Amino acid sequence: VSVIDFRTAPERYRHWQLTLDGAVATLALDVDPAGGLNPGYELKLNSYDLGVDIELNDAIQRLRFEHPEVGAVILTSANERVFCAGANIGMLSASSHAHKVNFCKFTNETRLALEDASAHSGQTYICAINGPCAGGGYELALAADHLILLDDGASSVSLPEIPLLAVLPGTGGLTRLVDKRSVRRDRADFFCTVEEGMRGKRALEWNLVDEIVPRSKWQGAIAARAGEIAATSDRPASAAGIAFSPLERTIEGERIEYANLSCVIDRDLMAANIA
């Protein structure tokens, strides 16, 4: 079994574009279709696998700790036709049960890390939804603090897992709709049965998003909202960030050695000893 390497850095990202502009950062999803973590599937329509989320998690942590000057983060798509189609179905169908379980756990932890950066580090996330935003894509958007939907007749939000796959959303979709956004339970249940999702005014009326903006005003509205939110942040903008140095480690058999700790895996006991 190949070892999944969680070490990355912005200059090595294949799926995200990270830009910094004073107090505002932008994370734009631009998935490389041929950049799957494993062979056998294509990451179409800005869908994601574990490799995409490893980069997202790295970016969230770096923005939080390396960049105290950043008070607002715009989460958007670099693809004009789609925001995010969610978890890649080809990847899921080709993966073992264990990989799918760990994939879902990691993606959940990444979204929780985003929310934690907002709750405890004063870094507000704005999701600028500029295309169809489905399944795990909308679940990622729901982790943000403020959702802005492009009102162009094509951009939409949806949780189509039930009508398309006969499974419940697996990355907090229903929970965040009801508990975080206070969407009525009957509406949340109905929304999950609508394959095409909802657009424009209806999405706003149901509190699925916070704002809708026409294409003619899109760029200006996103920049203005991000600037307003960044101006209210209490982050210590003049402080020095905590630089993430490369995490070096060696692997020999079932032993992993880092500079300050070691880990020995016992596969028979399904245990890991860390010292």
For each of these PLM feature ranges, what is it?
Residues 1-76, 180-199, 204-206, 210-275:
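Intrinsically disordered, low-complexity segments enriched in small/flexible residues
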Residues 14, 46-49, 84, 90-93, ...:
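Generic, ordered loop/turn and secondary-structure boundary motif
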Residues 22-29, 49-98, 108-128, 150-154, ...:
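A structural preference for short, pocket-lining loop segments at secondary-structure junctions
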Residues 28, 34-38, 82-86, 158, ...:
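Short acidic/His/Gly/Ser-rich catalytic and metal-binding motifs that mark active-site loops
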Residues 36-38, 93, 100:
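A generic structural signal for short coil/turn motifs at secondary-structure boundaries
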Residues 42, 88-91, 140-143:
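Short, glycine/charged-enriched secondary-structure capping and boundary segments
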Residues 68, 84, 120, 135, ...:
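A generic fold-level signal
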Residues 98-237:
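Conserved catalytic cores of soluble enzyme domains
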